[in-house]
Amino acid sequence: MDYVLGIDTRITLLITGFIFLSALLLGVWKYHGIRVDGAAHIYVDIAHRAALMYSFAGILLAVFTELSAWPTIVNLTADLVVLAFFIGAIASYVLHGLRRDTTNQFDGQIPAGLRLSMYGLIAGEIGGFGVLFSGFVAGQF
């Protein structure tokens, strides 16, 4: 029996595959830090772990997307919002790891831009998944 995944699911899996590949590459960077200094910079470690976690979360997004009752464009938009925030978070961790400028980006006075981006991340990730989950519930129950 042949089954073709929807384009929204395939795009989600493609992006998720790149996130997983980045996790593997970040693991090499982390290993290098451990080998040279005994421990990788905290944000290199966080970037590696976050990329691994987000890659598996992306697989969950793909499953909920495929089983959603909502139109393709709705599912794809929700996926892209969530994945964009995943990628943005990883990128910010990589930046801090490269610059070695902090061990806690939320220590002290938090700049308005960072605070705003965190509110966006919260709304985007929870809202995007909420769309997919409600589509799953509507389509499967």
Please give the residue ranges for each predicted region.
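Alpha-helical membrane-spanning segments of integral membrane proteins, especially the hydrophobic core
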Residues: 114-118
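Hydrophobic cores of alpha-helical transmembrane segments in multi-pass integral membrane proteins
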Residues: 11-32, 44-65, 79-97, 119-134
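Juxtamembrane membrane-water interface segments of multi-pass membrane proteins
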Residues: 2-7, 27-43, 58-77, 96-111, ...
